[in-house]
């Protein structure tokens, strides 16, 4: 995102709810030489399965474009950990339905857990 800030352009995020959209997104971004964020919601993962993530990662690894694979609105620790194990480069845990203090503390606790997990 640093280059986007320096050059003053936006980095789009796409939710590809099916494998049919992925090639179109990749082709358009390649044509524009535009970095992008591929966001996948946990509900999409529940019906697309881990094989879809493998397909997305294969496409991402085959391009020279900077691409972020992002878990969009993870609801719990298990979803976040699963996404990281699958190879997501970014995760977001959504605590918006929680009381304010819980919403603030949930990501803090998860961040600490992930830092410990990374060093195992």
Language-model features: locations:
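Structured helix-beta-strand junction loops
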Residues: 6-8, 32, 117
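Hydrophobic faces of well-ordered beta-strands that scaffold small-molecule active sites
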Residues: 10-15, 36-40, 67-73, 91-93
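Glycine-rich, positively charged N-terminal anion/phosphate-binding segment
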Residues: 19-63
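Glycine-enriched alpha-helix->loop->beta-strand junction motifs that scaffold or abut catalytic
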Residues: 32-34, 85-91
């Amino acid at each position: 995102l640093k280059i986007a800030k320096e050059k003053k352009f936006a980095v789009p995020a796409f939710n590809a709810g099916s494998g049919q959209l992925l090639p179109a997104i990749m082709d358009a971004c390649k044509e524009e030489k535009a970095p992008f964020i591929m966001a996948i919601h946990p509900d999409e993962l529940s019906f697309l399965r881990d094989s879809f993530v493998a397909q997305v990662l294969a496409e991402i690894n085959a391009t020279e474009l900077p691409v972020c694979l992002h878990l969009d609105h993870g609801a719990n620790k298990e979803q976040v950990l699963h996404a990281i194990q699958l190879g997501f480069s970014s995760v977001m845990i959504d605590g918006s339905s929680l009381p304010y203090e819980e919403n603030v503390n949930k990501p803090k606790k998860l961040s600490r857990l992930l830092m410990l997990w990374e060093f195992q």
